[in-house]
Regions:
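An alpha-helical support segment within catalytic cores of ATP-dependent transferases
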Residues: 2-9, 110-160, 164, 169-173, ...
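ATP-binding glycine-rich phosphate-binding loop
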Residues: 10-30
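A cross-family kinase active-site recognition segment
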Residues: 66, 81-137, 153-155, 186-190
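A glycine-centered beta->alpha junction motif in the catalytic cores
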Residues: 69, 74-88, 125-126, 240-255
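Pre-DFG segment of protein kinase catalytic domains
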Residues: 157, 180-183
Length: 279
């Protein structure tokens, strides 16, 4: 279906140059200069949605075309000259660029506030899927007692999916910004602290826990104190979300995820609740 959509869009000589890049919600291809993100017919609307959210984030100039037709949707963008996040490519310039990018996103207001009901509902789902893991259940109960810390926060524009595959670092010698986020379909209103927590658990943790914490806290220095304090809630919550995802979506990976992520979640909660640290 992806090939059919592109055949209707591209001349044969360009079609022959396409190389697959992967992708979960869509199939992604490049001809070296452009990226073609192809959505299935039932998700064709996501091409336009992602283009609008890229524009909201300040990346509208990268969008070249949005095509929606009988075969599905296609988002065409300029190719960013970089590769997915990797520890060996992470530098002080990378960290500064990440800080600037997330601060810029989180200045953009979104309607509504984060509600206590949605946070408790999320924790209940985690309790159900992790019902046979006593330490995880204890953490769920502890976070329920602290839910007031995060409830009532005004929503800001967040990417909400900054795992390593979506965070591109500029190739050495290339021009343009140091970092770029792809996959904006999930972007929307949320708590900036959750966005930073997702960045830690999905990307920064590849640096090792000590370096990941240091990078997170260095970024968070520029945020309001309240955002920094809510990391104590959202980082453990995000690890629980990861465990819930593995248990329900990819159970074969759950034992390893449990071994890697639960100790980090418990340690982060222990180290930053109660909030003794002078942020």
């Amino acid at each position: 279906m992806a090939v059919a959509a592109l055949k209707a869009l591209l001349p044969p000589e360009r079609l022959r140059r396409l190389t697959p890049l992967g992708g979960f919600e869509a199939r992604v291809y490049t001809d070296g200069e452009r990226v073609y993100k192809v959505y299935r017919k039932e998700e064709a609307h996501l091409a336009g949605l992602e283009a609008r959210r890229m524009a909201r984030a300040g990346f509208g100039s990268l969008v070249l075309a949005v095509i929606q037709g009988a075969e599905g949707g296609v988002l065409v963008t300029r190719r960013f000259p970089g590769r997915p996040f990797a520890p060996e490519a992470f530098t002080s310039k990378t960290l500064a660029a990440l800080s600037h990018l997330f601060l810029a996103l989180h200045r953009l207001p979104e309607p509504g506030k984060v509600t206590q009901e949605e946070l408790l509902s999320r924790l209940e789902r985690f309790a159900e899927s992790l019902h046979d893991q006593p330490e995880a259940l204890s953490l769920v109960q502890a976070l329920k007692r602290e839910v007031g810390l995060a409830a009532g926060v005004e929503r800001r524009f967040c990417h909400r999916d900054a795992w390593a595959g979506n965070l591109l670092l500029k190739a050495p010698g290339a021009e343009g910004p140091e970092v770029f986020l792809v996959d904006w379909a999930r972007a929307g209103g949320d708590d900036p602290a959750r966005d930073l927590a997702l960045l830690k658990t999905g990307s920064l943790d590849l640096l090792g826990e000590e370096a990941a914490r240091a990078a997170l806290f260095r970024m968070a220095r520029l945020d309001p104190k309240e955002v920094r304090e809510r990391l104590a809630f959202y980082v453990p919550l995000t690890y629980l979300h990861d465990l819930h995802w593995f248990r329900t979506k990819e159970p074969q990976g759950f034992p390893q995820a449990l071994e890697e992520k639960l100790p980090k979640a418990l340690a982060f909660f222990r180290d930053f609740f109660p909030r003794r640290r002078a942020w």
